[in-house]
């Protein structure tokens, strides 16, 4: 438990950030799941549109520090590879 005034403030800030980051992380996962769902249906056009919507979100979360930039690149590369496999 926080005893000093500054420790209490930091605890409040930490909780606020945790909730904000959880919301952002949930949004990121939702966008990625939409792409995966479109891929699983086999609809190339829908998968491409979902990927085009998800790509800037993934990049933004990496820029904000929510996920590592390499993880963002890995997500995009794997999803794009699956979409290209649909077209083939």
UniProtKB/Swiss-Prot annotation:
One Pfam family matching this protein: Ribosomal_S20p
S-S bridge residues: none
Gene3D superfamilies: Ribosomal protein S20
Record's keyword terms, sorted: Ribonucleoprotein, Ribosomal protein, RNA-binding, rRNA-binding
Alphabetized GO MF terms: small ribosomal subunit rRNA binding; structural constituent of ribosome
Cellular component terms per the entry's GO annotation: cytosol; small ribosomal subunit
Annotated segments matching region Disordered: 1-27
InterPro entries on file: Ribosomal_bS20, Ribosomal_bS20_sf
GO BP annotation list: translation
Keyword Kinase appears in the UniProt entry: no
Function: Binds directly to 16S ribosomal RNA.
Protein family according to the UniProt entry: Belongs to the bacterial ribosomal protein bS20 family.
UniProt protein name: Small ribosomal subunit protein bS20
Annotated source species: Shewanella loihica (strain ATCC BAA-1088 / PV-4)
